[in-house]
Regions:
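Catalytic cores and adjacent flexible loops of soluble metabolic enzymes
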Residues: 1-298
């Protein structure tokens, strides 16, 4: 998916009155009207994204932008972290009934619960993105455990927005159950403008996508069982229960009568049957170093 911010109308009339030497992260003063896209440019990007099979998601910053997006058939909206506690704006977005992704930088669980209630009351589908609103976000501030806790608290999908070039945040988020990942990408981190230095270049992004998908595969089902891939090693190293001494037919088998040997011989009783064997009755005469078979005891 591709996400584009749409900040029209969110600043005062003096929004660009920044001295040239005042810099935010990156290389330009931020915010900057030069970075904005017109409605026509957004529609052009939207159309292009659809032709290459991408969902196009925009972060509106005021009501008119919400109306523009809904009018043009937006399938999903994105609420920026700075507006997550702007409850009147949350209500407006939720009233449109368009599924919404809500970023949660700079918020706490109580504030998130208010937003959750707003969307639930409006019967508008939504999910949260866990994130840290710092560019780049330090590893120690990523606080990925929130993902698991938020899943438990709200019972909805939780994603992760990683504002850095590291891989650990994204891969850790996937391992903790994040369903959506947001990353900034750029043609080059040497380009002028905010956010470029905290973004991945496309080759790096492709590598991260591969690793994230591999992580999903590696997570598996959570069911623990004997796997087909383990059969080879099991066949080479598995142990069988072996008699340490002769045992007469009708005698009770004790733990002192038993040991285990590594053997690739077919049949035999595996060590996991130990508690079943101890106390059982020998059904025939058994000899020292004999591999115990299931028919030998009862």
């Amino acid at each position: 998916d591709v996400e584009v911010p749409n900040p029209n109308g969110y600043l005062s009339k003096d929004e660009n009155d920044f001295p040239d030497e005042t810099k935010a992260f990156g290389t330009w003063a931020y915010p900057d009207k030069r970075l904005e896209l017109s409605d026509e440019e957004i529609l052009d990007l939207w159309k292009y994204a659809e032709t290459i099979g991408l969902d196009f998601i925009v972060s509106p910053w005021e009501n008119n932008s919400v109306d523009f997006l809904v009018k043009n058939g937006a399938k999903c909206l994105k609420l920026a972290s700075i507006d997550t506690t702007n409850y009147m704006f949350c209500e407006y977005i939720a009233s449109k009934g368009v599924p919404t992704i809500v970023s949660t930088g700079m918020t706490n669980y109580h504030q998130q619960s208010i937003v959750w209630d707003i969307f639930q009351k409006a019967k508008c589908s939504m999910m949260f993105l866990h994130c840290t609103s710092a560019y780049p976000s330090p590893l120690e501030d990523k606080n990925l455990r929130c993902i698991f806790l938020m899943k438990e608290m709200f019972g909805c999908d939780i994603g992760f927005s990683g504002h850095a070039i590291d891989r650990e945040g994204t891969l850790g988020a996937v391992a903790l159950g994040a369903n959506v990942i947001e990353k900034h990408v750029t043609l080059s981190r040497n380009m002028s403008g905010p956010d470029h230095a905290a973004a991945l270049e496309f080759a790096e992004f492709a590598d991260l996508v591969t690793k994230a998908r591999n992580m999903v595969v590696a997570l598996g089902t959570g069911r623990k069982s004997f796997l087909d891939s383990e059969k080879t090693l099991h066949g080479v190293l598995c142990r069988k229960i072996v008699l340490k001494k002769n045992i007469n037919k009708g005698s009770k088998i004790s733990k002192d009568d038993l040991t285990t040997f590594v053997t690739n011989k077919e049949g035999g009783v595996l060590p996991e049957a130990y508690y079943e064997v101890v106390g059982a009755i020998a059904q025939k005469d058994l000899v020292k170093n004999q591999i115990l078979e299931i028919v030998d005891y009862k």
